UniProtKB/Swiss-Prot annotation:
Part of the phosphoribosylformylglycinamidine synthase complex involved in the purines biosynthetic pathway. Catalyzes the ATP-dependent conversion of formylglycinamide ribonucleotide (FGAR) and glutamine to yield formylglycinamidine ribonucleotide (FGAM) and glutamate. The FGAM synthase complex is composed of three subunits. PurQ produces an ammonia molecule by converting glutamine to glutamate. PurL transfers the ammonia molecule to FGAR to form FGAM in an ATP-dependent manner. This is Phosphoribosylformylglycinamidine synthase subunit PurL. SUPFAM superfamilies: FGAM synthase PurL, linker domain, PurM C-terminal domain-like, PurM N-terminal domain-like. Its main location: cytoplasm. Mg(2+) 1 binds at residues 99, 540. The active site is at residues 55, 101. ATP binds at residues 58, 97, 502, 539. Mg(2+) 2 binds at residues 123, 276. CDD domains: PurL_repeat1, PurL_repeat2.
Length: 739
């Protein structure tokens, strides 16, 4: 609990309270000896604790992030602003970004998840874009204990509660259950927006004397030190830190969004910059806006709208109260901006101005309470080159491939369809409004969500993907696969992958083996992005995802957006008609290490990860996209967790269509998780043209049927089950587990 009476500079030094706020002894010493050359007061120490946190400064991850490929002729705005922007032609652009809210969701799951959604929405409309879609990538422990069930229910309710109320459809995402996330769930939210390129905004504060205007909700004591909390290792003691979790109001956010977009579209001649007050609150938005412009800033904290009495400068600057934005407006145009926000019933107050020089000055009750170099806050945090050591777990890996023996292929399929990660998530995403705004073409449950772009023939395909198990067994190859699977989902939906955003969820970077996971997987992601021409344009780093010293699997969530140039090319994963030919594109090997089958049969994952070839992956994706654009494909579904047989079953379920298939593969290989594969259905009329284009890379399996039967004859056994019964198992598993 913070003292009401401010600590003196010597009190701060002697009590070492800065440690509680996230600064190390070395960082405090750097601040006093080099940056300020004096002892900082309580407020100044607080400012640096927030801005030098990993969440704001990327001090542990910046050397890693430099490895990412961020180029491409389609990139209009890369990393560095509130969100990235990619050209989609016709003077339009897509804006997207993902953010993590892991630690807050662990201690206060409803508000943690809800405010994660709210924050990422603000990042999108701060760029001038109207948000059109949300996605969520969730990781929980096994859904068997009461606390995990509580987390799941509250996180899902928080996401739906915020997104539904503000009127933005949730059209995709992914949910995985694994003991690795038992104490440290991951809640990653992604938002996508559309804008005309003429409306692009930036977070900057330029022009000496121009006004700095605070808009939106009043400031309270919620979320103070939230950036530092999000940057710290999680343990049981942290579960009491609910005051570090923000409280959201989606109805306020809706008003704020509409008001800000009105200012951007109708008052652009006086608007200089706009930025969300996110992590580290007012200090982050104001210092970053000034630093990017090479300006100084002077703020009067007495003018900050407050919902609680007696707030200190420390609290006012570091509060992470939600639904707040900061604008820089031409001097003399303040009243013009006030009128817009008054119309929506929102506070709009000039709290400061842009100044000459490079100082960041705060005044409170007529006194100067902070006077520091603005760049020291925003861009001069120490950057650490962490030690990297190959993890012991990789040195002790078995070189042998896990080879399952299936006594009962159909029985194994029944069990597979009921695994929490494989089973239908409709009971979760069914609570989200996926069709508000009436632009959703493909709802959650297919490979990617698809949303049309109004007044055009275009659509966007969006997805989130990563398999942490693969990265646990091989961080670099697992990073490549994460990007590849996201691209597969876009291509299977008829889209051309454009770019990615990421949430890099890892353990403690000060542990050499944990830093190895981060660094190696980043190299894999970078290589795949360059090959697929999908630059990283935005993202977020969430480190110290450890509970009592136990780290999660390395989990770099990849959010990808693709462009479908013609809506006729939109493709879904479900079989459409009886009598269609069914193919698998790509070869199937005995790849079981890290697979869902290995976990299901042995309770763990182990061994060296199977081989993966990005060139083969890229070729297969290009072949499929060409076939789709030529009108040769009725359905396409990427093969991922659970293998080929699970993919086939999932394609049967939506239309209750059966299949009669045959293969010379052994039954076990139908559960292998070899990459670079798709299950494709083709009408008889297109079969010859399809085979002419795709041979020798496709294998004919058989045909869809009008029967209620999934029958696959393999080299040694047959899968034989009613589609309706298999679907019942698949749909009922998760609701049963979560009771």
């Amino acid at each position: 609990m913070l003292k009401k009476q401010p600590l003196s500079p010597t009190d701060v030094r002697d009590s070492k309270v800065y440690r509680d706020w996230g600064l190390t002894d070395a960082e405090y010493q750097l601040l006093t000896d080099k940056v300020l050359q004096r002892l900082p007061n309580e407020t100044e120490t607080g400012l640096f604790s927030g801005m030098w946190s990993e969440h704001c400064s990327y001090k542990n991850s910046k050397p890693v992030l430099k490895k990412f490929w961020t180029q491409g002729e389609q990139v209009l705005e890369g990393p560095g602003e509130g969100a990235g922007i990619i050209d989609i032609g016709d003077g339009q652009a897509v804006v997207f970004k993902a953010e993590s809210h892991n630690h807050p969701s662990a201690v206060e799951p409803y508000e943690g998840a809800a405010t994660g959604v709210g924050g990422i929405i603000r990042d999108i409309f701060s760029m001038g874009a109207r948000p059109i879609a949300l996605l969520d990538s969730l990781r929980f422990g096994e859904p068997t204990d009461a606390h995990t069930k509580y987390l799941i229910s509250q996180v899902v309710a928080g996401i739906g509660g915020y997104g539904n109320c503000i009127g933005i459809p949730t059209i995709g995402g992914d949910t995985v259950f694994d003991a690795s996330y038992q104490k440290n769930p991951l809640v990653n939210a992604m938002c996508v927006g559309i804008l005309d390129q003429a409306d692009i905004q930036k977070g900057q504060a330029t022009g000496i004397g121009n006004a700095v205007i605070y808009v939106g909700a009043k400031t309270g004591r919620d979320g103070i030190n939230g950036a530092s909390f999000a940057s710290a290792e999680f343990n049981d003691a942290n579960e009491t830190q609910r005051s570090a979790v923000q409280v959201g109001d989606p109805f306020m956010e809706k008003l704020l969004m509409e008001a800000c977009l009105e200012v951007i579209h109708e008052h652009r001649d006086v608007l200089i910059g706009i930025q969300d007050m996110g992590a580290a609150g007012l200090v982050s938005s104001s210092a970053e806006m000034a630093s990017k412009a090479g300006s100084g800033l002077s703020l009067n904290l007495d003018l900050v709208p407050q919902r609680e009495t007696g707030m200190t400068p420390f609290e006012l600057m570091l509060s992470e109260s939600q639904e707040r934005m900061l604008l820089c407006v031409k001097a003399g145009a303040e009243a013009e901006i006030y009128q817009v926000f008054e119309k929506y019933g929102l506070d709009a107050v000039t709290i400061g101005k842009v100044t000459a020089g490079h100082q960041y000055q705060l005044f409170h009750h007529g006194k100067l309470v902070a006077d520091v170099p603005v760049d020291a806050l925003a861009t001069k945090a120490p950057v650490y080159e962490r030690e990297k050591k190959r993890p012991t777990r990789l040195n002790h890996q078995s070189h042998h491939q896990f080879m399952p023996r299936l006594v009962d292929a159909t029985g194994t399929l029944k069990k597979m369809l009921q695994q929490p990660t494989i089973a239908s998530k409709a009971s979760l995403y069914g609570t989200y409004d996926s069709q508000v705004q009436t632009n959703t073409v493909v709802k959650p449950g297919s490979d990617a969500g698809v949303i049309r772009i109004r007044h055009t023939d275009k659509a966007l395909a969006v997805t989130t993907d990563v398999n942490g198990r693969y990265l646990y067994l091989n961080p670099r190859v697992g990073g490549e696969i994460a990007v590849a699977e996201a691209a597969r989902n876009i291509v299977a939906s008829g889209g051309q992958p454009l770019g990615i955003t990421d949430c890099l969820n890892y353990g403690n970077p000060e542990k050499p083996e944990q830093f190895y996971d981060l660094d190696e997987s980043a190299m894999g992601i970078a290589r795949a992005c360059q090959l697929f021409n999908t630059p990283v344009i935005s993202g977020n780093v969430s480190l110290n995802n450890e509970s009592n010293g136990e780290a999660i699997y390395p989990t770099p969530m990849i959010g990808m957006v693709g462009l479908i140039k013609h809506q006729k090319d939109i493709t879904t994963s479900d079989f459409k008609h009886a009598g269609d030919a069914v193919y698998v594109l790509g070869t199937t090997e005995a790849d079981f290490n890290g697979s869902e089958l290995q976990k299901m049969l042995t309770g763990t994952i182990s061994g060296e990860l199977f081989d993966f070839d990005l060139v083969t992956e890229n070729r297969n994706q290009r072949l499929l996209l060409t076939a789709i654009q030529k009108g040769l494909v009725a359905s396409a579904h990427d093969v991922s967790e659970g293998g080929l047989i699970t993919t086939i079953a999932e394609s049967c379920f939506p239309q209750n269509i059966g299949v009669e298939l045959a293969s010379d593969l052994p039954a076990a290989n139908f559960f292998a998780e070899t990459q670079s594969r798709f299950v494709i259905s083709v009408t008889p009329a297109q079969q010859a043209a399809f085979e002419s284009l795709m041979e020798p890379y496709v294998t004919y399996l058989g045909r869809t049927t009008a029967t209620d039967r999934l029958h696959v004859q393999t080299a040694d056994q047959a899968f034989d089950i009613k589609v309706s019964f298999a679907k019942q198992l698949w749909e009922g598993a998760l609701p049963c587990l979560l009771k």
